[in-house]
UniProtKB/Swiss-Prot annotation:
It comes from the Bacteria. Residues 487-490 are annotated as: G3. One of the essential components for the initiation of protein synthesis. Protects formylmethionyl-tRNA from spontaneous hydrolysis and promotes its binding to the 30S ribosomal subunits. Also involved in the hydrolysis of GTP during the formation of the 70S ribosomal complex. CDD domains: IF2_eIF5B, IF2_mtIF2_II, mtIF2_IVc. This is Translation initiation factor IF-2. It holds the Pfam family IF-2. Residues 50-196, 260-346 are annotated as: Disordered. Its main location: cytoplasm. Residues 466-470 are annotated as: G2. The keyword Coiled coil does not apply.
Length: 930
């Protein structure tokens, strides 16, 4: 026997596969899915179980759609003919429904009930589909009969129209049934609606009744009061009535007078359109609390608003009628003009120059027109926007009887005020500070050697020509107390630098050589110290040398006003030997003793102020300034104004080269972070924030520029002859470049002091840093030559100078520059030698050998390095050392020269501080042929 699958049975019956699977399981068959197969007998049994729910196929003759009554009957009851035909046809035997009920378990099974309800709904849907299918079959039979009967065209159109109409009516009936079901469900879920119109009408009627009742009560009260007053007046005599009437008239006149004098206060406009008259006897309607839930309360509030809107709906119309051509409104008297309130004049008036009339009027609470009138009476024509000077303002205040005081404005850009103001320091916060000691003296009298001995280092050995080139600041500790030392150059060219040192110092150590005595710079140092009112400690140095005569030194100093305490003076004398460290402890004890007598105090709690000791431009760091903190505490990231520039302290290093974050009073530090390099000797001050510091710095730079422009000499009748005479003079143009600002100032001042008849020196440009291309271009344009002091030209600048034939003079000792300039200007030049650079090398590695020194491994990058040539050590464009080679080797062999591109090793005579990336410049001196 053949088998059938369940989905094939479902397809034949027009059922879904899951329904057929469920029916098979109910019949006790072991099936798993719609793909399971069963015997034909079992398939017939499954099909028979669906027969009662399926719609029977009935052949019906096509009805003629001509009669309108039949169509109406079909529209009203479309399912009745099908039911009648089903009853007429004998049904096939099926299993009774009681079997299904008997198959259910006795206990209630909700899952089975849901499945049963789902099956019933599915059967009803199938039944409706069967009815539709029968109608379609009837329509198809009618079409066939029509074709066979010879009425093909008209019958087809009529049948099609009839079927479409039947489908449309069935769909409409179905939608109506669904809509009724949805409305029934919604009516069961939604609460009964409130009839707002009826509610509003009831509320309005209630309010009207309440208003009528209250109006009637007020009318009754008014009538009762009127009758009581009439009875009281009947009891009084006529004379008393007349007296009371007269009193009332007088009171009315007094009230009218007060109303005329006192202006009526204008109340702010308030919209009273929806406000009702208060009725204390009316009870609050609590109908909105009768129902629970926020939705009920919200609906009740909306009904209240509807009632209120209905009551006030005619408000705009009434308002328009009131604003119409009403004669009463036009005839109303205008309100009295309010008078200006009287303000008392101030007793004092603080003014500033340039105040306008309007500003003065606002301050003294008067009209500008009144002040303009007074000024006109005083003979001053002014408007309210015109500025007045201080004298005019004082005269105006005298006319008003006010005491005028000029307001003292604080200049934010003036940093000098911090050094002179008495209230800047807190007297309660003053603490003892280290003394600042300046070492002064003549050239080669041992100042730097003394300082070197104090610091236990050997920086004095490397000074070019034995002269300190710029100020150094250092700190030492003696007996647990700090002492700050400033070292100043001793040459005459550095007068301004010594003057700066004397202005910031507390004690001066005057170094005088015992074998040399008092020299010109010694006398100058004495004058600087006396001008600054600084005590002097005389250190008679070099007592170990033969021919030393300390007594002669004491006598010479006494002639210049420096008396020893042994001779009845106030200056301490100490005989020392800086070279052999003799009596150094005694000198330091004397310094601490003098400092203790002076009682040096400082306030570390205020913002830092102080002086610039030195400033320079560094290739990698930018502007670097050496500062001496005099008051307060300097911190990293402080906004600072230094001279005519400003910035923020980015990094701070002490005299040992170590990074620090805080610098107290009398502490020398080197800072970075400034926009430009300041001038040595400038004051600095820390501001509250960067904004105020920027404003102060820009204002100071602007003022300095204006001052420089105003200092430009103008031609006048007095200097006309001098100007014409100067035109006959020959001028020597010079461009000065140096390593530090102090050296630039010293060179400029020294060269301008050279007095040669018929020749003068003009400083075209002076700056800090290496010689660059712009300097060469400027020298070519101005026909000048360049003087470099402890700096070197860049390779590009050197090439450009050779191409443009610009002369560059490089020096490391200042008095040699001055002597050379004087000889050149006098035309007495001796045969001279010209420096010729023969090669350059770069240090790649260093090797320290005991008892020998430091060996530098180098590579020649340009030219050659010869054994008999002189060398310079250049670091970041600055000459560190200038000397001769002690050894030159290629591997282990001594060589006379190392050419370009080759490597070798060298040692420099007297210099061991060679570092990687140092540039070794080799040069020879060649005689210039004239």
């Amino acid at each position: 026997m053949s088998k059938k699958r369940l989905y094939e049975i479902a397809k034949e019956l027009g059922k879904e596969s899951k329904e057929v699977v469920a029916r098979a399981k109910e019949l006790g068959l072991d099936v798993k899915s719609h793909s399971s197969s069963v015997e034909e007998a079992v398939a017939a049994k499954i099909a028979a179980s669906f027969k009662p729910a399926a719609a029977p196929k009935v052949e019906a003759k096509p009805a003629a759609p001509k009669v309108s009554a039949e169509k109406k009957a079909e529209k009203s009851e479309p399912a009745k003919p099908a039911v009648a035909k089903e009853e007429a046809k004998p049904a096939e035997p099926v299993a009774p429904k009681t079997e299904k009920v008997a198959a259910k378990p006795q206990s209630r099974n909700f899952k089975a009930e849901r499945e049963a309800r789902a099956k019933e709904q599915a059967e009803r849907r199938k039944q409706n589909k069967g009815n539709n299918r029968d109608q379609q079959q009837n329509g198809n039979r009618q079409k066939n009969d029509g074709r066979n009967g010879g009425k093909q065209g008209q019958s087809n159109r009529d049948n099609r129209r009839f079927n479409d109409q039947a489908k449309k009516e069935q769909g409409q009936q179905k939608r109506r049934n669904e809509r009724r079901q949805q409305e029934d469900k919604r009516s069961n879920q939604v609460a009964p609606r409130i009839d707002f119109k009826a509610r509003a009408a009831a509320l309005k009627a209630e309010q009207n009744a309440e208003y009528a009742r209250s109006s009637e009560e007020r009318f009754k009260q008014y009538q009762a009061a009127k009758e009581a007053l009439a009875q009281a007046n009947k009891r009084k005599e006529p004379e008393e009535i007349f007296e009371e009437a007269a009193k009332l008239a007088e009171q009315a006149q007094q009230v009218q007078a007060v109303v005329e004098v006192v202006p009526e206060k204008k109340e702010p406009a308030v919209d009273t359109r929806r406000k009702k008259q208060a009725r204390p006897d009316k009870n609050r309607d609590d109908y909105d609390h009768e129902e629970d839930g926020p939705r009920k309360q919200q609906k009740n509030r909306s009904s209240q608003n509807q009632v209120r809107n209905q009551k006030n709906s005619n408000w705009n119309n009434n308002k328009k009628n009131k604003k119409g051509n009403n004669k009463n409104n036009r005839n109303q008297t205008p309100k009295p003009v309010t008078e200006r309130k009287f303000h008392e004049l101030p007793t004092e008036f603080e003014y500033t120059d340039g105040m306008t009339v309007a500003e003065i009027a606002k301050r003294i609470k008067r009209e500008p027109a009144e002040i303009v009138k007074k000024l006109f009476m005083m003979g001053v024509m002014a408007t309210q926007n015109q500025s007045l000077d201080g004298e005019t303002i004082e005269l105006l205040m005298v006319d008003y009887g006010i005491e005028a005081k000029q307001k003292v404005e604080v200049d934010n850009a003036d940093i000098e005020r911090f050094f002179v103001e008495d209230g800047y320091l807190n007297e309660d916060e003053l603490v003892e500070r280290p003394p600042v000691v300046t070492i002064m003296g003549h050239v080669d009298h041992g100042k730097t050697t003394l300082l070197d001995t104090l610091r236990n280092s050997r920086v004095a050995t490397g000074e070019a020509g034995g002269i300190t080139q710029h100020i150094g600041a250092y700190q030492i500790v003696e007996n647990g107390k700090k002492i700050t030392f400033l070292d100043t150059p001793g040459h005459a060219a550095f007068t301004s630098m010594r003057a700066r040192g004397a202005s910031v110092t507390d004690i001066t150590i005057l170094v005088v050589a015992a074998d040399d005595g008092v020299m010109p710079q010694t006398i100058e140092a004495i004058n600087h110290s006396k001008a600054a009112n600084v005590p002097i400690i005389v250190a008679i140095n070099k007592i170990d040398k033969p021919g030393a005569n300390p007594e002669r030194v004491i006598g010479e100093l006494a002639e210049h006003g420096v008396m020893s305490t042994a001779w009845g003076g106030d200056s301490e004398f100490v005989e020392i030997s800086a070279k052999f460290n003799q009596n150094i402890e005694e000198l330091l004890e004397t310094v601490l003793l003098v400092a203790e007598i002076q009682e040096l105090k400082a306030d570390p709690t205020v913002r830092a102020i102080g002086t610039v000791i030195e400033a320079r431009l560094d290739k990698g760091k930018g502007a670097v300034a050496t500062l001496l903190v005099q008051q307060g505490t300097l911190n990293v990231q402080d906004p600072i104004v230094v001279g005519n520039t400003f910035g923020r302290v980015r990094a701070m290093t002490n005299d040992l080269g170590r990074r620090v974050k805080v610098a107290g009073p009398s502490t020398p530090v080197s800072i970075t972070g400034l926009n430009e390099a300041p001038m040595a000797g400038d004051h600095f001050a820390v501001y509250e924030d960067e904004k105020s510091a920027r404003a102060a710095g820009e204002e100071r730079a602007k003022r300095a520029l204006m001052k420089q422009r105003q200092a430009t000499q103008r031609v006048s009748l007095e200097n006309l002859f001098d100007t014409l005479k100067a035109g006959e003079l020959k001028s020597v143009n010079v461009i000065i470049k140096a390593d530090v600002q102090g050296s630039v100032e010293a060179l400029s001042a020294s060269l301008q002091k050279i007095d040669v008849e018929g020749v003068k020196v003009t400083i075209v440009h002076s700056a800090v840093g290496a010689i660059n291309e712009s300097d060469v271009t400027l020298a070519e344009a101005s026909n000048a030559f360049i003087v470099g002091f402890n700096v070197r030209p860049t390779p590009q600048a050197r090439q450009q100078a050779e191409a443009d034939d610009v002369e560059i003079r490089l020096h490391s000792i200042i008095y040699k520059v001055i002597e050379e300039m004087e000889e050149a200007m006098k035309g007495m030049l001796d045969p001279e030698f010209e420096e010729k650079v023969i090669g350059e090398a770069v240090i790649r590695e260093t090797f320290k050998v005991s008892k020998v020194g430091t060996i530098g491994g180098f590579m020649v990058i340009n030219g050659k390095v010869a054994r008999d040539s002189k060398v310079r050590v250049i670091r970041d464009g600055v000459v560190i050392y200038d000397g001769e080679l002690a050894s030159l080797k290629h591997y282990k062999d001594d060589v006379k020269e190392v050419t370009n591109g080759r490597e070798g090793g060298l040692m420099i005579d007297g210099y061991n501080d060679i570092k990687m990336d140092d540039v070794i410049e080799a040069y020879v001196m060649e005689e210039i042929k004239r």
